[in-house]
Regions:
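Short coil turns linking two alpha-helices in DNA-binding domains
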Residues: 20, 31-33, 45, 59, ...
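Short alpha-helical "recognition helix" segments of helix-turn-helix
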Residues: 20-25, 52, 138-145, 170
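Short, charged recognition helix plus adjacent turn
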Residues: 65-104, 184-231, 240
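A short, Lys/Arg-rich alpha-helix, primarily the initiator
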Residues: 1-21, 65-66, 80-139
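Short, solvent-exposed alpha-helical "recognition" segments
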Residues: 41-48, 71-75, 158-166, 190-191
Length: 245
């Protein structure tokens, strides 16, 4: 939910009282037309708040927490669960980790340390995150709390996106820290959410060979289903064009 323009202007006055709109846009990298349009509409995007916060060395989480819609972000950060951390490891990183385990190394090949994990978010980070915290009823609770239709919520997950409002609502519905979904959706970084340095790597290292291999297998199966649907859709499209001559 975008923040009200009036509340945004009060907040901006508090962190940059002497800065002009041109100054703010220049240091934050936001186009002046973009900010002007948001102010005219009376709704300022959360991404705008985050970009300006970073430019003025203000915590994006603390900045968002000053707005009523995101008051749940206030207070000391809550650590992510083990499942949340693992969900933010990309499938390629999981595969590299599997191959780097001693159990997978052949007699001819020495075990090599895998490269550092790629930064969150990744190609399926949003759906993986929701699946990691879902007890089977989270989607229903989010729909009841926000009014979003279940099919619309599922569509966002399939597209690997989640609005900040729904990300926080999902966290609350699952009983986890309120910033995990914002990391999964790419609005804020792990560090900005208060995640300890190296937390994802530590979570990965704690997985047994069996658990790691099973997780990588599940990810590959999910990827296979997506690719098959894409291939089927492409084949149908080509058939339609052929029938049209």
């Amino acid at each position: 939910m975008p923040v009200p323009a009036k509340a945004f202007q009060r907040w901006l006055q508090g962190i940059a009282p002497d800065a002009s709109t041109a100054d703010v846009c220049r240091v934050s990298g936001i186009k002046r037309t973009t900010l002007a349009q948001q102010l005219v509409r009376g709704k300022v995007a959360e991404g705008t708040v985050v970009s300006i916060s970073r430019a003025y060395n203000v915590s994006p989480v603390a900045a968002l927490a000053t707005f009523e819609a995101y008051r749940e972000l206030a207070g000391p950060p809550r650590l992510p669960t083990h499942a949340e951390l693992v969900s933010q490891i990309s499938t390629p990183d999981l595969m590299r980790a599997v191959l780097a385990r001693p159990a997978m190394a052949s007699a001819e090949n020495h075990v090599m340390d895998p490269p550092p994990l790629s930064a969150a978010p990744h190609a399926t980070s949003v759906k993986n995150w929701v699946d990691a915290i879902d007890d089977g009823e989270v989607r229903h609770r989010v729909s009841a709390a926000t009014g979003i239709a279940p099919q619309n919520y599922s569509a966002q997950l399939t597209a690997n996106r989640l609005s900040p409002e729904l990300a926080v609502a999902t966290s609350l519905a699952a009983g986890v820290g309120p910033t995990g979904g914002l990391v999964a959706a790419g609005l804020i970084t792990e560090a900005e959410a208060g995640w300890p340095p190296g937390a994802r790597q530590a979570a990965l290292d704690s997985l047994s060979d069996g658990d790691l291999t099973a997780l990588a297998g599940d990810r590959l199966q999910a990827l296979g289903r997506v690719l098959r649907r894409h291939e089927q859709d492409q084949a149908k499209t080509e058939m339609i064009w052929e029938n049209l001559g």
